[in-house]
Amino acid sequence: VYGEKFETLGEFKFYLSTGWNLGMQYKGVEYGIEGHNNSFDIWIYNKGDIANGLTLEETLDFEFDGVKLRDFITTDDVEILERHL
């Protein structure tokens, strides 16, 4: 599903917890989130990792430009660039 925003935080949590990866743009910066074995990494495209080995809750609480992921992932402030396994 390309470019489709998440309707609820629960949908987003389920999506990540089942092993899917995400590309998104927030405030003009492209980020990636990848999960493996209940551990998550966050990176900036073409710049490298900014967080490694996070739990799901730590991922949701990770701040992007001062705002927690959980507070903007379902809003129109974020553009979902890709979703894939």
Set out the residue ranges of the language-model regions.
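Mixed-charge, Lys/Arg-enriched low-complexity segments
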Residues: 1-4, 52-85
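Compositionally biased, low-structure terminal segments
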Residues: 7, 13-15, 41, 46, ...
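Negatively charged, low-complexity tracts enriched in Asp/Glu with abundant Ser/Thr
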Residues: 1-23
